């Protein structure tokens, strides 16, 4: 079996908002990498056995901060790439000089490559479009570094050490705005570090299945299946690895999208022949939420009840030794870096679930090394439907945060129908994958309407569609008026409890993507 971790890159995080992008670009090239805080122990760095090290950007100023790269980084004799702050601290630690720029540079810039011989710019054109985001700049490279690229506002746009495989760039090759950023990353990782491209979906599947078999043996495993991307992919890979030793518990809250519960059972229980226990808990959730209007309270009630029901069912499974979870690499990084990270967290996630306290279960997390895009590709490799893997994000509390105020059975059914029409038409008009997220929101207010010759006094549905790269900011989707008119007409005509449809044109900020 191929050892997918044999050649790897270590990324030291100085707090840049782009650090995870660096890791994703390295992996896209086909090389495994991991992110650790910049102040991780020197012995850890020494024993990690990386083929190369990347120093991320960060929000600090080198000349008024004591945040430096660990000296061990430059003593291991392996290649180093410093990005933005990473370049500045590397140059400064080798006798160079960094000062505050007269003018901060944020946005696209043209750099001129001065030297592309056997370095990160090999086989690249003389002029390159890149993405700058910095307030400081290198003013003196010192005796050890030479300038290999420059721009109008950044005379030192890239450097190379004169005798060691150390390179630095003032711009961000990891962003898509840098036209040939992936080529720069590939030149460093493959050509300079000498990494073999072993990190691909086929090898990951083979490696994961072997690891799961070795770890689990003949033990039984329990998985909470939600129908979301992560738990679905965990179910698929565990089933391939251990077959009937896996039992999935699907808690149907009644707050899912229209027919979603049946679709989950169809894919996993019928098509893939996985042992799935479906718990119809709709009434328990409605009872628990009766009279509750506060969004945060609704979230907590839904989350706690979900865990309680899962615990009840899990306790019935005899001799289970493992609890599988859909933890992915982004969760691991956020959990590990909460204290060190300088990047500002804009919003917490709607995660529900937890480890049953009274059960002595060991944790199994087959996806903990993978980013979301890798999880989706893994799912395709395991035979899961494309539309299941590439659906828009859905909050943990489900429609509970898309019904404003109190949740009632009538409200849930009304929203499910309206939301399904919106989604169906997005697919029909090839617009679904042009937007990042689209859904309906139930407003518990009534509005007068006329359908046929009849006066109608019913509820309002708001349609929400946004375009976003990272979901930390978003713009409202400029969907065609004819399309919105069609969706509105269908909802008002087909969903009797709705008399009016409105479209949300609020960006994020100032609004959030979800209404609650």
Curated annotation (Swiss-Prot):
Domain Glutamine amidotransferase type-1: 8-198
One Pfam short name: GATase
Enzyme type, top EC level: ligase
Binding residues for ATP: 226-232
Record pathway: Purine metabolism; GMP biosynthesis; GMP from XMP (L-Gln route): step 1/1
Superkingdom field: Bacteria
PROSITE patterns: GATASE_TYPE_1 (PS51273), GMPS_ATP_PPASE (PS51553)
GO molecular function: ATP binding; GMP synthase activity
EC number: 6.3.5.2
Sorted UniProt keywords: ATP-binding, Glutamine amidotransferase, GMP biosynthesis, Ligase, Nucleotide-binding, Purine biosynthesis
Catalytic function, reaction form: XMP + L-glutamine + ATP + H2O = GMP + L-glutamate + AMP + diphosphate + 2 H(+)
Record-annotated GMPS ATP-PPase domain positions: 199-391
Cystine connections: none
InterPro entries: Class_I_gatase-like, GATASE, GMP_synth_C, GMP_synth_GATase, GMP_synthase, GMPS_ATP_PPase_dom, NAD/GMP_synthase, Rossmann-like_a/b/a_fold
Active site: 84, 172, 174
Cellular component GO terms, alphabetical: cytosol
Gene3D superfamilies: 3.30.300.10, 3.40.50.880, HUPs (3.40.50.620)
Alphabetized NCBIfam families for the sequence: guaA_Cterm, guaA_Nterm, PRK00074.1
Quaternary state and interactors: Homodimer.
Entry-linked PANTHER family: GMP SYNTHASE [GLUTAMINE-HYDROLYZING] (PTHR11922:SF2), GMP SYNTHASE-RELATED (PTHR11922)
Function comment: Catalyzes the synthesis of GMP from XMP.
Name recorded for this polypeptide: GMP synthase [glutamine-hydrolyzing]
Organism: Francisella tularensis subsp. novicida (strain U112)
Gene name for this UniProt entry: guaA
């Amino acid at each position: 079996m191929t050892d997918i971790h044999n050649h790897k890159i270590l990324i030291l995080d100085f707090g840049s908002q782009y650090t995870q992008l660096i890791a994703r670009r390295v992996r896209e090239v086909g090389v495994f990498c991991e992110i650790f805080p910049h102040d991780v122990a020197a012995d850890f760095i020494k024993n990690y056995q990386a083929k190369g090290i990347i120093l991320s950007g960060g929000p600090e100023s080198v000349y008024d901060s004591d945040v430096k790269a660990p000296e061990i980084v430059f003593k291991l004799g392996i290649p180093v790439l410093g990005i933005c702050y990473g370049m500045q601290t590397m140059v400064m630690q080798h006798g160079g000089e960094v000062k505050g720029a007269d003018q901060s540079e944020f946005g696209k810039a043209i750099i001129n490559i001065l030297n592309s011989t056997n370095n990160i710019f090999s086989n690249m054109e003389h002029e390159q479009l890149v993405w700058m985001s910095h307030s400081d700049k290198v003013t003196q490279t010192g005796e050890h570094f030479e300038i290999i690229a420059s721009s109008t506002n950044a005379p030192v746009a890239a450097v190379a050490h004169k005798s060691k495989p150390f390179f630095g760039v003032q711009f961000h090759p990891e962003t898509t705005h840098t036209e040939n950023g992936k080529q720069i990353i590939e030149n460093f990782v493959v050509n300079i570090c000498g990494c073999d491209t072993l990190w691909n979906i086929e090898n990951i599947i083979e490696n994961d299945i072997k690891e799961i078999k070795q770890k689990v043996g003949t033990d039984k495993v329990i998985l909470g299946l939600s129908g979301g991307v992560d738990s679905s992919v965990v179910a698929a890979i565990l089933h391939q690895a251990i077959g009937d030793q896996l039992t999935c518990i699907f808690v149907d809250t009644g707050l899912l999208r229209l027919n979603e519960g049946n679709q989950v059972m169809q894919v996993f229980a019928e098509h893939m022949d996985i042992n799935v226990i479906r718990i119809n808990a709709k009434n328990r959730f409605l009872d628990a939420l009766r009279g509750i209007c506060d969004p945060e309270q609704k979230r907590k009630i839904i989350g706690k009840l979900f865990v309680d029901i899962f615990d009840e069912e899990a306790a019935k499974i005899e001799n289970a030794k493992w609890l599988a979870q859909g933890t992915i690499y982004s969760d691991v990084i956020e959990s590990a870096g909460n204290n060190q990270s300088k990047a500002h967290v804009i919003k917490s996630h709607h995660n529900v679930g937890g480890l049953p306290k009274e059960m002595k279960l060991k944790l199994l997390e087959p996806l903990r090394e993978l980013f979301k895009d890798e999880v989706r590709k893994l799912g395709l490799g395991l035979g899961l439907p494309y539309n299941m893997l590439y659906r828009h994000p859905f909050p943990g509390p489900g429609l509970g945060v898309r019904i404003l105020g109190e949740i009632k059975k009538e409200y849930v059914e009304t929203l499910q129908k309206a939301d399904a029409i919106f989604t169906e038409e997005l697919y029909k008009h090839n617009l679904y994958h042009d937007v990042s997220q689209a859904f309906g929101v139930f407003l518990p207010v009534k509005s007068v309407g006329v359908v046929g010759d009849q006066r109608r006094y019913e509820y309002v549905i708001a349609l929400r569609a946004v375009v976003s790269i990272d979901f930390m900011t978003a713009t409202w989707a400029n969907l065609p008026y004819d399309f919105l008119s069609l969706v509105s007409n269908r909802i008002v005509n087909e969903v009797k409890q709705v008399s009016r449809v409105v479209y949300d044109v609020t960006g994020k900020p100032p609004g959030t993507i979800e209404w609650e």
